[in-house]
């Protein structure tokens, strides 16, 4: 049922758009679940990887009971302890292994949870990734923010949220080459060699509030 107060309708529409925006910017499977347990937003990668011919409402219930239970436990922890780091290191869905992260999205009194799926069936060694997440601290991330130029930091934020170099160049009024050079400096600073490594650092840094605020500021300035 639609709200009778137009202002409430606008607020609910904005919340929906915000959630859809969050999942659309990711280049990995991502979804948002609300407090009713419904998938309120999914991106194309998620639909292609997990939904297929399924009814989207049935996806969660199609998972093995043990997997669904572990997902639900982490999701509830994310809702009740927004500052905690909630993730499942390795879970099989279909024929692939995934690292799944649960990030609370808070809209006033309403808490939804963003789910991010990192495929572990790649050429990345699990132990290396675990060490990478451990070694990149919040202080190191802030050190990069303080040492980088304004453009380097903005490119880092946009690229990590899934924007391609062409889009970044257009948003920031720079060349594609400048965007690529900025990412090369990011790799050099953190001692990494691939976008997968960068995403692991980005999404396990526990600094999502800062990153989301920075993203909205960048996009607002580009309007």
Curated annotation (Swiss-Prot):
<keyword id="KW-0805">Transcription regulation</keyword>
<comment type="function">
    <text>This protein is essential for positively regulating the expression of transfer genes that are involved in the conjugal transfer of DNA between bacterial cells.</text>
</comment>
<dbReference type="GO" id="GO:0005737">
    <property type="term" value="C:cytoplasm"/>
</dbReference>
<keyword id="KW-0804">Transcription</keyword>
<keyword id="KW-0614">Plasmid</keyword>
<keyword id="KW-0184">Conjugation</keyword>
<protein>
    <recommendedName>
        <fullName>Protein TraJ</fullName>
    </recommendedName>
</protein>
<dbReference type="InterPro" id="IPR016383">
    <property type="entry name" value="TraJ"/>
</dbReference>
<keyword id="KW-0963">Cytoplasm</keyword>
<keyword id="KW-0010">Activator</keyword>
């Amino acid at each position: 049922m639609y709200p009778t107060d137009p202002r409430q309708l606008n607020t609910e529409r904005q919340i929906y758009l915000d959630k859809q925006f969050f999942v659309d910017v990711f280049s990995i499977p991502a979804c948002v679940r609300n407090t009713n347990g419904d998938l309120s937003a999914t991106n194309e990668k998620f639909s292609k990887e997990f939904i297929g011919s399924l009814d989207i409402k049935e996806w969660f219930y199609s998972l093995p009971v043990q997997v669904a239970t572990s997902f639900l436990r982490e999701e509830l922890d994310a809702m009740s302890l927004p500052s905690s780091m909630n993730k499942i290191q390795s879970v099989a869905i279909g024929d692939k292994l995934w690292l799944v992260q649960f990030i609370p999205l808070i809209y006033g009194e309403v808490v939804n949870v963003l789910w991010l799926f990192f495929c572990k069936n790649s050429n990345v060694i699990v132990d290396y990734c675990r060490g990478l997440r451990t070694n990149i601290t919040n202080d190191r991330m802030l050190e990069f923010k303080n040492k980088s130029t304004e453009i380097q930091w903005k490119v880092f934020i946009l690229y990590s949220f899934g924007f391609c170099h062409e889009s970044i160049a257009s948003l920031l009024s720079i060349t594609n080459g400048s965007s690529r050079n900025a990412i090369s400096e990011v790799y050099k600073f953190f001692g990494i060699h691939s976008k997968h490594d960068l995403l692991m650092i980005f999404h396990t840094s526990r600094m999502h509030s800062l990153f989301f605020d920075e993203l909205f500021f960048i996009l607002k300035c580009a309007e």
